[in-house]
Design a protein with these regions (language model features):
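Gly-rich Lys/Arg/Thr-decorated short loops/hinges at beta-loop-alpha junctions or inter-strand turns
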Residues: 22-24
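C-terminal alpha-helical interaction appendages
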Residues: 77-79
């Protein structure tokens, strides 16, 4: 799709620099006509800026890693919005199980809850499938201005989110979380 308006589709590819940017990981996506020379040049460029290339072999909305992230994010939002689990408990479980520095809700706060909502709306506009709509509870957070890190409040309060506190992973301070 990115090359649709370009006369030389063999010279086009798409890059998605990951957040947080200090991860130095970039997803690169070819189209059906990206030439071998362009692929080699793209990979050489990413290596020259000390980024790790993750290759998506052909075009797909959202790249590969973001599609996997979307499935996780969508299910986490559903579990929260339908009252099955507290976001902090789900983040604790995720962080303990996969040894990460933050969980899905912490990551959504980093990305920005308005951005999370807009991405879900983009999928809905393309599919027309109501299951692609963001949950109303997320819409309400965005309407209140609770956008995550950038606004100081989202699923956590910033600049010192609960998941960085000593003992938080063990459930200490749970009653203070609200």
């Amino acid at each position: 799709e990115i090359g649709a308006g370009v006369g030389r589709k063999d010279k086009t590819f798409n890059l998605n620099f990951m957040t947080p940017t200090e991860d130095d990981m970039v997803e690169v996506m070819w189209n059906d006509r990206t030439s071998a020379a362009t692929r080699e040049a793209a990979l050489a460029f990413l290596e020259s800026i000390r980024n790790i290339a993750i290759v998506t072999r052909r075009e797909i909305k959202g790249f590969s890693l973001n599609r996997v992230w979307r499935a996780v994010k969508k299910e986490c939002l559903r579990l929260w919005a339908e009252g099955y689990i507290d976001p902090h408990d789900l983040d604790r479980a995720f962080m303990l199980e996969w040894r990460t520095g933050y969980g899905p809700f912490g990551l959504m706060d980093k990305v920005g809850l308005d951005v999370v909502r807009d991405i879900e709306l983009s999928y809905y506009r393309e599919s027309g499938d109501e299951s692609d709509l963001p949950p109303r509870a997320l819409e309400e957070m965005v309407e209140r201005g609770d956008l995550g890190e950038k606004s100081g409040r989202g699923f956590y309060e910033y600049p010192d989110p609960a998941y960085l506190r000593p003992g938080w992973l063990r459930g200490e301070g749970r009653e203070e979380e609200g």
